[in-house]
Amino acid sequence: SFGASAVLGVIGVVSLSKAKTKPQKLFGTIPLLFSIQQLTEGLLWISLRNTDMSNWLPFLTYTFLVFAMAVWPFWIPFTIHKLETDEKRKRLTKVFAWIGAFVAIGVCFILFSYPVKAVTPFCLNCPDAATASLRDHLHYEFAIPTLVKNLIVAFSVLYIAATIVTPFISTIKKMKWLGVVFLASYLFAVIFYTGFVISVWCFFAAILSFVVLWIILDLRKTVPKNTKGT
């Protein structure tokens, strides 16, 4: 987590330095936000293993989950909407930004209404372990009633629509690769890391920071000099 945070921080600084317009700069904050998110989970690991930092557990847990579950469904479509120039697609991406905002508000309400804790559970049936062994990934346990769990499922569908579908809608060259990376990382986490999807998906999804920089570098070629900062 700390290594990823450092790399993502550098990518974020480079992305912002290369961005020419305000929409590009908003888009360029994605790697920095991922950097903060991974730093938070790194500190969460330490607080789980160090009793002196146990008081930080709730703050770090909720901070990570707000990033993972509430920030991205809004920020991804919102920044893509700001970058979009085609009027029809711009209106459509705006709809997904509003969907993301709805998800973010709903998820935050649930997060702060019910207890949640980060754990490193023992795995009894993992293929690489004949006996119980401690997993290298964090699992987040939510103490929520069945009805709310159903809402979480609904929010998950909208989350995927906001973060994965929006990049495919954009007319911006290479933006679809953002959706491809998001989708691939999600499927990878669901298939190979059941029970650790939130933690693992966010770790692998951070790879899209390289795609963000790639897109910004490509957008620089199409921005006239007199539009810098607009």
Question: Predicted segments — roles?
Answer:
Residues L33-T40, F102-F109, V181-T194:
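Aromatic-anchored segments of alpha-helical transmembrane domains
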Residues V10-L16, L48-R49, M53-W56, Y62-G100, ...:
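Internal transmembrane alpha-helix with an interfacial aromatic "cap," most often the third helix
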Residues A70, I80-A161:
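Membrane-proximal helix-loop-helix units in multi-pass membrane proteins
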Residues I30-S47, V71-P73:
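A generic, lipid-embedded transmembrane alpha helix
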Residues W45-T51, I110-K117, A189-F196:
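Juxtamembrane "helix-exit" motif on the non-cytosolic side of transmembrane helices
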Residues L16-G28, H81-V95, F168-M175, T222-V223:
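Membrane-interface helix-boundary motifs at transmembrane edges
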Residues S1-V10:
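Hydrophobic transmembrane alpha-helical segments in integral membrane proteins
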